[in-house]
Amino acid sequence: MGTEEVVRTNTVAVKVDFASLSDEDLVTYCQQQLPDDLTAYKVLVERYEGMVFNLCMKFLGSRQDAEEIAQDSLLQVFRKINQFQGRSSFKTWLYKIVQNYCRNRISKIIRKREVQESYEDHAKEDVSTTTFDSADSSEKSEYIQEALNKLKPNDKEIILYKFVSGMTLQEIAEVTEIGASAAKMRYYRALEAFKEAYERVTKNTQATKNI
């Protein structure tokens, strides 16, 4: 996609390479030009759509849900970009949007599951359907996802922000709206909980394979 465009400032025409601009400059252009000109918005989408999808995928575990929520989150950026005031980085603001959409979807999934279980008293998640043929990277990914799913929601969020999104502890503090020291403590507790969950998953899997 071409990201260069001639922008008129008063009476002067300036050629702008949008792909080289910072997030903050792109946001400024969006606030000035949307909905008439989508160039700056499209650059922001291309810059973050991969990370947004990966985060949604880790939160939700379903590709269909992740694609839908990622699309909804980026559309919300289009709708709400004029409300961005620069008190945090654009990335932090975006991840707050993603976090809220993922939480809402998870709540809907849980409610739906509870309704189903009220009619199917024997309904349980079948975790034995996965066949482990070899200890390859896909197997390790399954272990990681299962361990993540065993964490408390707040612990899972922090682990995903740190390792999937590459956020700093300061950015995590801003997204979760807690102090920097509290974010650091919560991160280390979450990391310890993840390590314990991962060890249990791998031990249980190995024990099952040896039967």
Where are these regions (language model features)?
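N-terminal module of bacterial RNA polymerase sigma factors
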Residues: 1-50, 58, 211
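C-terminal edge and immediately downstream basic/flexible tail or linker adjoining helix-turn-helix-like DNA-binding
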Residues: 2-9, 143, 174-177, 191-211
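Internal acidic/polar
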Residues: 19-20, 26, 112-137, 141
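Amphipathic, Lys/Arg- and hydrophobic-enriched alpha-helical face
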Residues: 45-63, 80, 148, 197-201
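Structural recognition of an alpha-helix C-terminal capping motif at a helix-to-coil junction
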Residues: 54, 68-75, 88-100
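Sigma70-family region 2
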Residues: 61, 72-89, 109
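Arg/Lys-rich amphipathic alpha helix in sigma70-family domain 2
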Residues: 83-85, 99-117
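DNA-recognition helix of helix-turn-helix
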Residues: 155, 164, 169-170, 174-201
